[in-house]
Design a protein with these regions (language model features):
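Beta-strand elements of well-folded, non-transmembrane domains
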Residues: 16-18, 55-59, 74-76, 87-89, ...
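Hydrophobic pocket/interface hotspot
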Residues: 23-27, 33, 51-53, 72, ...
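Hydrophobic ligand-binding cavity/cleft-lining segments
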Residues: 1-50
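A short, structured loop/turn motif at beta-sheet edges
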Residues: 20, 45-48, 73-78, 97-106
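Glycine-rich portal/gate segments that line the openings of hydrophobic small-molecule binding cavities
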Residues: 44-87, 142-146
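Intrinsic-disorder/low-complexity, polar/charged segments enriched in Ser/Thr/Lys/Arg/Asp/Glu/Gln
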Residues: 7-13, 38, 50, 67, ...
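Hydrophobic/aromatic beta-strand elements that line small-molecule binding cavities or substrate pockets
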Residues: 12, 40-41, 67-74, 85, ...
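Beta-strand/loop substructures that line and gate deep hydrophobic ligand-binding cavities in soluble
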Residues: 84-137
Length: 147
């Protein structure tokens, strides 16, 4: 994990014994990605593929649900998606890279959160690794694999 100023960056890889196209079905779906994140209370996926996350952060300076407008910036099916999310308290960039392996698919997730209020960076520094655990568990559950 790297912390620079109010920015936190986490990268994690894991392998799953499922073909890349099936993993892509989950990773490319903005709703499935949002539902795996614990601070996302609800979300709306729009017709253009963008999504609005409504997040609650348990930090003193944020006393309300925050809207985060997300959109995919780059998609290379079935191997890579990069999305960005913007709000008044933080910006987030998520990258998901899928690599075929002999046993299935290697999934590399990178998240960068840039907080613009005190406490946002500390919250994600403590919790971003766990959010990647949640994403992995949601993916494994979605493709019904015993990992």
């Amino acid at each position: 994990m790297l912390t620079v100023g109010m920015t936190v960056r986490v990268e994690r890889s894991f392998e799953i014994p499922v073909d890349r196209e099936r993993v892509w079905e989950f990773i490319a779906d903005p709703g499935k990605r949002a539902s795996a994140i614990s601070v996302v209370q609800n979300y709306t996926v729009h017709d253009d593929g963008s999504a609005t996350w409504r997040i609650e952060l348990p930090i003193p300076v944020v006393s309300q649900t925050i809207g985060v407008e997300t959109e995919d910036e780059e998609r290379r099916p079935p191997e890579y998606v990069r999305f960005v999310g913007r709000s008044k308290v933080m910006n987030v960039v998520g990258e998901h890279e899928l690599t075929e392996t002999n046993e299935g698919t290697k999934v590399t997730n990178t998240f960068v959160v840039d907080g613009s209020l005190p406490g946002v960076e500390r919250f994600f520094k403590r919790n971003l690794d766990g959010e990647l655990d949640n994403l992995e568990a949601a993916l494994v559950g979605d493709v019904e694999v015993d990992a």
